[in-house]
Amino acid sequence: LDSIQQKRKEIWNMYYQNLQGISSLSLPVLPDYATNNAHAFYAVCATPEERTALIRYLKSHGVYSVFHYLSLHKSDFVKNQKWEVEELPQADKYTDCLVRFPLFYALEPDEVKYICEQIKSFYTSERDEASFGER
């Protein structure tokens, strides 16, 4: 179990180190008081359109990234209750803009490098920025 956890942390750190220079992506913040269990690696895109374009771009290059979750206040369960639910714009921002990248034990360093190269390529290649909205 320790070796599995250690490898996941190494993969997480590879992502973090390789993606730090992309100003359009917000990377995870690990407070000084916390520890990293490396269960997932994610980034937050500037807009929902950007996230959709990034996921589509990565898929076209053989990388399967996914969105993370639906805000609980917008889930069918909550919608079907008689509760008065307020708007939660920060939760919605993460629902709409967060993307998770592959992170599993069998992932090899050269694969992580390739994924990071594709993410960088998305942000550095010439593309029609209108295709994913305003920054």
Show where each model-derived region lies.
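PLP-dependent aminotransferase class I/II
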Residues: 1-135
